[in-house]
């Protein structure tokens, strides 16, 4: 089970592909964001998902929503993944899996494996929506854009 909607997302700090540490509450103060957790750099599904976020980056950017990818891969792997796919957003390395566990994205029977889960957070880091069991990254992103657009209009 993912973290519940309307709960404040837990704070964390992880190394980022931008060369600095990312701290959720500090770096996203007064800014909405998407935290998307994924299993493995360069796997087919994760590559498709990253490319879908890349291809819709401008939509989220115009809505002032930051996209952040998180997996248990090393920073070296993340740097290669980001460069190869020309990703315009940062990736965070959770090599020990602590943040994946905190956000309940680990499979119970295979705790070293992260399941594809996306959290949409508002500017106060409250969870607005959760997407899990993602099989079609394009449908996932389309649904998220529709959800964000509705919430922005309110």
Predicted feature locations:
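Chalcogenol-based redox active-site neighborhoods
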Residues: 1-154
């Amino acid at each position: 089970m993912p973290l519940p909607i309307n709960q404040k997302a837990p704070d964390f700090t992880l190394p980022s592909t931008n060369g600095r540490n990312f701290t959720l509450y500090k770096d996203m103060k007064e800014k909405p964001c998407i935290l998307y957790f994924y299993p493995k750099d360069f796997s087919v599904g994760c590559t498709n998902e990253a490319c879908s976020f890349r291809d819709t980056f401008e939509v989220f950017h115009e809505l002032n929503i930051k996209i952040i990818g998180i997996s248990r891969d090393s920073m070296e792997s993340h740097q290669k993944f980001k460069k190869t796919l020309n990703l315009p957003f940062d990736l965070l390395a959770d090599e020990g899996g602590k943040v994946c566990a905190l956000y309940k994205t680990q499979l119970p029977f295979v705790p070293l494996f992260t399941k594809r889960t996306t959290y949409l957070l508002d500017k106060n880091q409250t969870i607005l929506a959760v997407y899990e069991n993602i099989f079609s990254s394009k449908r996932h992103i389309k649904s998220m854009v529709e959800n964000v657009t509705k919430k922005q209009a309110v």
